[in-house]
C-alpha cells in the first residue's frame, strides 16, 4: 500500500496544500494510506481529512515518517542542512540553477532520499501538469499593483 504523507508548509503565510479532502478520499478509495500533518496556517481544516479516513500527524513530523512514506508538499523544506531520506514530491527548484538547488540535491544524496520535482511533471506530450493557470499572471499583476499603491502612501 502506498503511504502519502502531506506535510505542513514551512514558508510563512503559505496556506495552500496540494491535496484536498476530496482528493484524499479518492486516494483512500484506491487503497492509499494518507497522513496529513496539522498546520496552523493551512487554508483547509483537518476535519475534512479526518472525515475521509486520513491519519493526522503533528506539524513537522515528516522526518520521522515511516521509511516507505512519500512526503508531499508544495514549497521548500527547512534549510537546516539535515540529510533527506524518503521520497519527496514538491516544487524543488533544484535543476535550473535556482538558488539553493545544489544544496538541496546534496541533502537528498546524503540521506538517500529522492526528489520528484513537480516542475518536471509532464504528460505524454511533454506538457507540464503542475503549472500556473491562466489567471495566475493576472492575479500576480493585481497584487503587484496593490503593493505599489501601498508604497506610494
Whereabouts are the PLM-identified features?
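An N-terminal-biased, well-structured beta-alpha scaffold segment characteristic
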Residues: 2-107
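Glycine/serine-rich phosphate-binding loop and adjoining beta1-alpha1 elements at the start
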Residues: 2-3, 79-153
Amino acid at each position: 500500500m502506498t503511504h502519502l504523507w502531506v506535510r505542513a508548509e514551512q514558508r510563512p503565510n503559505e496556506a495552500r496544500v496540494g491535496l484536498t479532502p476530496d482528493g484524499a478520499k479518492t486516494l483512500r478509495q484506491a487503497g492509499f494510506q494518507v497522513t496529513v500533518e496539522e498546520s496552523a496556517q493551512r487554508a483547509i481544516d483537518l476535519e475534512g481529512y479526518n472525515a475521509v479516513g486520513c491519519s493526522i500527524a503533528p506539524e513537522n513530523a515528516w522526518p520521522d515518517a515511516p521509511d516507505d512514506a512519500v512526503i508531499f508538499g508544495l514549497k521548500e523544506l527547512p534549510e537546516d542542512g539535515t540529510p533527506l531520506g524518503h521520497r519527496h514530491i514538491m516544487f524543488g527548484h533544484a535543476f535550473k540553477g535556482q538558488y539553493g538547488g545544489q544544496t538541496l540535491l546534496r541533502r537528498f544524496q546524503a540521506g538517500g532520499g529522492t526528489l520528484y520535482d513537480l516542475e518536471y511533471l509532464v504528460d505524454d506530450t511533454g506538457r507540464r501538469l503542475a503549472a500556473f493557470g491562466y489567471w495566475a499572471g493576472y492575479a500576480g499583476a493585481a497584487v503587484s499593483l496593490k503593493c505599489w499603491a501601498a508604497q506610494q502612501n
